[in-house]
Amino acid sequence: MKHKLQMMKMRWLSAAVMLTLYTSSSWAFSIDDVAKQAQSLAGKGYEAPKSNLPSVFRDMKYADYQQIQFNHDKAYWNNLKTPFKLEFYHQGMYFDTPVKINEVTATAVKRIKYSPDYFTFGDVQHDKDTVKDLGFAGFKVLYPINSKDKNDEIVSMLGASYFRVIGAGQVYGLSARGLAIDTALPSGEEFPRFKEFWIERPKPTDKRLTIYALLDSPRATGAYKFVVMPGRDTVVDVQSKIYLRDKVGKLGVAPLTSMFLFGPNQPSPANNYRPELHDSNGLSIHAGNGEWIWRPLNNPKHLAVSSFSMENPQGFGLLQRGRDFSRFEDLDDRYDLRPSAWVTPKGEWGKGSVELVEIPTNDETNDNIVAYWTPDQLPEPGKEMNFKYTITFSRDEDKLHAPDNAWVQQTRRSTGDVKQSNLIRQPDGTIAFVVDFTGAEMKKLPEDTPVTAQTSIGDNGEIVESTVRYNPVTKGWRLVMRVKVKDAKKTTEMRAALVNADQTLSETWSYQLPANE
């Protein structure tokens, strides 16, 4: 009898162990769990989010919203040894709809509940009973990226499907988004939003954080997986499964949003001690055929859309080229420390276009630059689309380019002139562009290398002069191109690349001179 009891006990223990092993190995939250919800939503009518925000928060100004601060002592995971911490955004202003935030552990999913005790409200007068059941507007991720004993914010997810990410020594600048719909179309843009998040609790030794998100909008839903890998360059690995509810005019995949107010290619119309003011100064593209393209940004007087058609893009990004503080001179906003963002597709994305949208703006508070990939063909509503890519947030722009291919260091615009016999320069009605090219391999070339430029211009202009000379300061080459515009009320397209005989030395400088009206 005793032997039978021991055998039964051993069998029970064995079954318990097997059950534990089965449970721990088979249960795991994944993007497929989010995709099921996204696909289910796509088959139903869209339900607009409802705001539960009291008017004192909904109608507040930005200065008041800034007074609502998260209490750092109450950071989520503060009592765990994980290097990652979470803090949350309170609702206020146009952040007036709650998002659900969940924690994923090895065995369960747990809702992170809102509590006003997480926050200090400064001088904002409010009734505590009216806020006790509010939700969060978003969240931020903290990590000791600059110092082992200090947690710095590295990710912010707040508003629609926007998120911002930085690496070591960087400050927030441009944003990424989950999805863009009908950007710059006359019908108006649709802004999908992340309505729910699932964040995996990291282990003490983890150097990456996994975040899942459910996206929703009137005409699309989506499931997203973000793996954040902080470092000198912070890299975000993105996987998305997108479902259309209804047909869209244009789908923007891996969208980036930035700001360009003025720079040397388009100087400020008013006197300003800051020579440049922008989060990014150009769109870089690595096309499917291997060509590298650089499109300097503008702040046009009218909406401008540029489209670069290709098959299977190798990468694109909005970059901040030129890191010298003297280029910006802004002690408050430190544009010299703002990151570039580079999208690297995984797999073949097929035929489509990298599009750049430039929107007029009068000040730096408005994001007026958008770049994204838009596929030529979209599936019928309900069918799944898969996109995988990484976004690298970096201040090392030269590493975001092929080392054997020279890149544009800067583009400067000037009044075109001709040196007279008396050595005085006389304006001749042209516009001059001074374009400096540099690169690791280019610096190795002897200065007497016969570098020339291949240039072209659209129907609205004429190239009057094009010269290339060695630049001993940058150990690169400088292109000076004088152009005559036929109709100033129209845009003018220009292209240029440096060559040595039949060898291409540089990326293609592709510039659009905005209409001046």
UniProtKB/Swiss-Prot annotation:
UniProt signal peptide: 1-28
Pathway the protein acts in: Glycan metabolism; osmoregulated periplasmic glucan (OPG) biosynthesis
Stated name of the protein: Glucans biosynthesis protein G
Function: Involved in the biosynthesis of osmoregulated periplasmic glucans (OPGs).
HAMAP family: MdoG_OpgG
Native source species: Escherichia coli O1:K1 / APEC
SUPFAM superfamilies: E set domains (SSF81296), Galactose mutarotase-like (SSF74650)
A GO term from the CC aspect: outer membrane-bounded periplasmic space
Molecular function per GO: carbohydrate binding; catalytic activity
Record family assignment: Belongs to the OpgD/OpgG family.
Gene (name only): mdoG
InterPro entries recorded: Gal_mutarotase_sf_dom, GH-type_carb-bd, Glucan_biosyn_MdoG/MdoD, Glucan_biosyn_MdoG_C, Ig-like_fold, Ig_E-set, MdoG_OpgG
GO BP field: beta-glucan biosynthetic process
Highest taxon of source: Bacteria
Subcellular location: Periplasm
Main location: periplasm
Keywords: Periplasm, Signal
Pfam families to which the protein is assigned, alphabetical: MdoG
